[in-house]
Amino acid sequence: MPQNEYIEESIRKHGRRFDHEERKRKKAAREAHDASLYAQKTRGIKAKLYQEKRRKEKIQMKKTIKQHEERNATQRGSDAQTQGAVPTYLLDREQESQAKMLSSAVKQKRKEKAAKYSVPLPQVRGVAEEEMFKVIRTGKSKKNSWKRMITKATFVGDGFTRRPVKYERFIRPMALRQKKANVTHKELGVTMQLPIIGVKKNPQSPTYTQLGVLTKGTVIEVNVSELGLVTSGGKVVWGKYAQITNNPELDGCVNALLLT
């Protein structure tokens, strides 16, 4: 037996106090008063955090109460049947029970969709243009300043060809270009180095997505054919999305979590 389970063993051997249930009930009844007293006495940042916590609890409580009310609501359809036959012009009207079922199904689908497209990092720090781009001065007397060099890691495809130097506005240094990512599969618990296919979405800006900038929170598409994943139809999965969880420009590599 583990050394820290002596209380559980004592309960199994000797049982609980004779007034255990009564003490438990009274303690639960006092919780509201204790919470009220704590809310009145607390000051500063602790008070703000506590009020925010209570607000979330109340919102959740209201949602739960609403769900119970919907479940326990009387159904008009059953009342109409008990009162008598339904008129002809009301036969095509949906019963409340059916409407409730449809509503529940729609809510469940929304929850599943939200879970499907949820990402490990829902919020990331914003990156300023000054941090993202470095101004490159050109011209004989270095007066032109319309060129920008990207200071973050980037991805460019195999078929990428640079524009002529005179017309190239955004410069992506070779040292910061990444072609592979260390992708972790959460369910399998393995990490593999997979080739990057493309950049799906950069949370900072659509321009950064177009330029293939890899920052923390960026959703990329990786080649997962090596993992041997198959669809329900038996076809091999070629590409899947993954979200970058580190700062590639600081670490020198791309670490990502596969979105399942």
Curated annotation (Swiss-Prot):
This is Ribosome biogenesis protein nsa2. The keyword Zinc does not apply. Gene3D superfamilies: 2.40.10.310. Residues 13-28 have a biased composition (Basic residues). It is found in: Nucleus, Nucleolus. InterPro entries: NSA2_fam (IPR039411), Ribosomal_Se8/biogenesis_NSA2 (IPR022309). The keyword rRNA processing applies. A motif (Nuclear localization signal) lies at residues 11-18. Residues 1-34, 53-84 are annotated as: Disordered.
